[in-house]
Structures are given as C-alpha cells and as structure tokens.
Amino acid sequence: MASVLQKLITPLFSGPLEPPRNKVTVVGVGQVGMACAVSVLLRELADELALVDVVEDKLKGEMMDLQHGSLFLKTPKIVSGKDYSVTANSRIVVVTAGVRQQEGESRLNLVQRNVNIFKHIIPQIVKYSPNCILIVVSNPVDVLTYVTWKLSGLPKHRVIGSGTNLDSARFRYLMAERLGIHPSSFNGWILGEHGDSSVPVWSGANVAGVSLQKLNPDIGKDTDRENWKETHKKVVDSAYEVIRLKGYTNWAIGLSVADLTESIMKNLNRVHPVSTMVKGMYGISDEVYLSLPCVLNSAGVGSVVNMTLTVDEVSQLKKSADMLWHIQRDLRDL
C-alpha cells in the first residue's frame, strides 16, 4: 500500500543534487558564534549553515533550536557536528572558537590560550573546504588571523580577520550620536589592531565630504578643547564595558560578521576595515595582520585602498604592527 508521501508527491527527478554554492560554517557555538549564525540566517546569505563545536549537547541543541525556526527562514538546510566532515564544501568559514575574554583582560593576553586550539581546527577546515574563505573572529583577532594564515596554507587574500570593522562601527555610532546624525552618514575609520592600540583616522573623518579636521584642526589631539579624542577612548573601552555589564559581547560582532559575509557572497566590492597581511605597506616590514580599508568581493580581499594618512597616524599603525609582531615572533609550531 502506498504511503502518504507516495500518494502526495510525484517525483520527477531522483538524481543527486548539486552541492551548496553558498554554504557558511560557523566554528564555535558560543555567544559570538550563534550571533554570527543568526545574523547570517536573517540576512538570507547562506543556502546551508553548518555548526561545529566540541560540546556536543549544546551543539545539537543550538542546531535544533534554529531548525525549529525554519518556517521563518530561507536557509533550507541547517546541520551540525563535532566532525568537520559536516563543513564540506563551505564557501565561507567563520571561526569564533576559543576561550572567552575575561573582564579587564587585554585581547593580547588571550593569544597563547587560543593558538593551541587553532592547531586542531584550521587543518580540518581546509581539508574539507580547500576553496573556502576564512573569516577569523576569535580574539586576539589580528594575531589569530596570522596564525590561521600560517596553519591553513591558504593565500593571504582568503584569510581575513574581522578586525576593526566593529571598532569602526562603534566609532561611527558614537561620533554620529554626538553630531545628531545616523551612523551611516558619518564617515570615519579605525585601523590597525582590533583593540587597545587601534588607530582613529581623524584626518579622514567627514560628514557629506566636509572634513571635521578642517573645521577643527586639533580634532583628536590632546590640545582639542572639544575633547573629541574621548570618543576613540570610548571605542576602545566599549567592549570592556559591555563585558562588565553582561559578561560578553556578541550582537554587534555578529552583525559585523554578517556584513562582511554579504560583501563576499554577493561580490559587492564594498570597502571594509578588516585584518589583512600588511607587510610592505606603510613601511611595515614584518608579517603581521592589521586592519586596513579592504575591498571585499568573491575572492575575499580583492584589494587594499591606499589611504592617505598623516605622519602621526602612520606612526601609530607601525606601533600597532610592532606590538603584534613582538607577540607573534615567540609563537611556536606554526
């Protein structure tokens, strides 16, 4: 006797379907990983989402929770597994795994604790998705993006750190709040390290093409009577403040990562401040990853915008690079 399914559906094709073309994998289903996953789903960027973690019960629970919302989503397949075979044929892999930053802890103090974890993760990702683009989110993101590049063997344009995309978003929000406009109407960039030594590009800050530095030549300096420099200090302190208040940061970085994912998936050629290999740029001679304005497209980092920086801004950028290299040079087994 025919089943309900057989009576209801008449198949016209029974062969194998093509593998997913826009599969996204998120490694690590903690607060940040799930914020990235949900943001990608809500922006309809993936035709398959894979989740990977070592904590199997939580992993399965997160997968089921998302699957139960399938009616409200347009991603036909959501899978998970401890084994990296579940990530096969990913176009973009978002790496959020690692130990969490504690209150008052510098991102750079996290490095050695996370490097050993990456030694197990990255080779497995590349094994199953050799053509993927890697977006590293785990902190300290600049050093761990360098570590990922070394461990993966992938070309530098396909290994990207989330970098100062979020720092710049915080900067634009805080500056726009003070100016009484929407964040998208304030143009400003934070470059360098994602964290304590980030570099605000005051020389390029503008609204509708009007340079704030021309209106106030001292903007961002200690001599500035309006104390705009305080805004950058708030950017640096904001992550620590959120961690103090709620224990972690997740929503803003999730939205930021989805923004990067969209530019790559849709080949948008949008410019984002993300962490990329900067050796040979701005007089930096070491192999370090720092955030510069990068054109993101289907290749990953398609190109880097040569921003006109002041002597002081270049000096700060070099200082960022020196600090990161000082840590990287002592890393082993890369």
UniProtKB/Swiss-Prot annotation:
Keywords: Cytoplasm, NAD, Oxidoreductase. NAD(+) binds at residues 30-58, 100, 139. The keyword Mitochondrion does not apply. It catalyses: (S)-lactate + NAD(+) = pyruvate + NADH + H(+). The active site is at residue 194. Substrate binds at residues 107, 139, 170, 249. It is found in: Cytoplasm. Gene3D superfamilies: Lactate dehydrogenase/glycoside hydrolase, family 4, C-terminal, NAD(P)-binding Rossmann-like Domain. Its EC number is 1.1.1.27. GO terms for biological process: lactate metabolic process; pyruvate metabolic process. PROSITE patterns: L_LDH. It comes from the Eukaryota. Belongs to the LDH/MDH superfamily. LDH family. This is L-lactate dehydrogenase B-B chain. It comes from Danio rerio.
